[in-house]
From Swiss-Prot:
It comes from Halorhodospira halophila (strain DSM 244 / SL1). GO terms for molecular function: 3'-5'-RNA exonuclease activity; tRNA binding; tRNA nucleotidyltransferase activity. Phosphorolytic 3'-5' exoribonuclease that plays an important role in tRNA 3'-end maturation. Removes nucleotide residues following the 3'-CCA terminus of tRNAs; can also add nucleotides to the ends of RNA molecules by using nucleoside diphosphates as substrates, but this may not be physiologically important. Probably plays a role in initiation of 16S rRNA degradation (leading to ribosome degradation) during starvation. InterPro entries: ExoRNase_PH_dom1, ExoRNase_PH_dom2, ExoRNase_PH_dom2_sf, PNPase/RNase_PH_dom_sf, Ribosomal_Su5_D2-typ_SF, RNase_PH, RNase_PH_bac-type, RNase_PH_CS. One of its GO terms (biological process) is tRNA processing. This is Ribonuclease PH. The gene is rph. Its EC number is 2.7.7.56.
Amino acid sequence: MRPSGRRADELRPISIQRQFTKHAEGSVLIGFGDTRVLCTASVEARVPPWLRGQGRGWVTAEYGMLPRSTHTRSDREAARGKQQGRTVEIQRLIGRSLRAAVDLQALGERSVVVDCDVLQADGGTRTAAITGAFVALTDALEGLVRQRALPASPLHGQVASVSVGVYRGEPVLDLDYAEDGEAETDMNVVMNDAGAFIELQGTAEGHAFRRDELDRMLALAEKGVGELLQHQQEALAT
């Protein structure tokens, strides 16, 4: 039995609120159960120096957690003087995932920076960030189309992400904090709407996982991502 009482293949309640802030070209407050992440997408009329003059755009991401997003307060990374390795890893993952859905040539020489700030953490912050960031990015790019800065959106598909793992010997979908702390295996999966995998991050914590467990986890991830893609579509339709 999972601590939340959910079935092994059941997502936490998902909420996606668009236009959560007024200044960013795209902004989303996403909830995976008690995890809350604010995702804002900002359009900049410039690209990194190594891309200048190539006619291509760039999509990148930054990630951070509020000091009291967890059970006990953590110092801001700015106060420590540097980012933690976990932060750098996660924001690179978010950026890679979003770029997989964008035709950077069609974007032109401009950048979209997506900031993902964890307001409340209860497991799955990076997967929630990717799923919400895609919606914020979509709104930002559609804004460029409305302004006639682009003839069409450079998006060529959807992207969403979910965690899976082995908890008390059973593969489960969308781990919360209580499960994540005890999981024998923890895996983050990023997929597109064509059913293809963009990234897999998996680690055996308690014991090594078998091929049959991996197959069951990937099947759960496919199911979960399919449901998250539907949540994105419903949010974008409102």
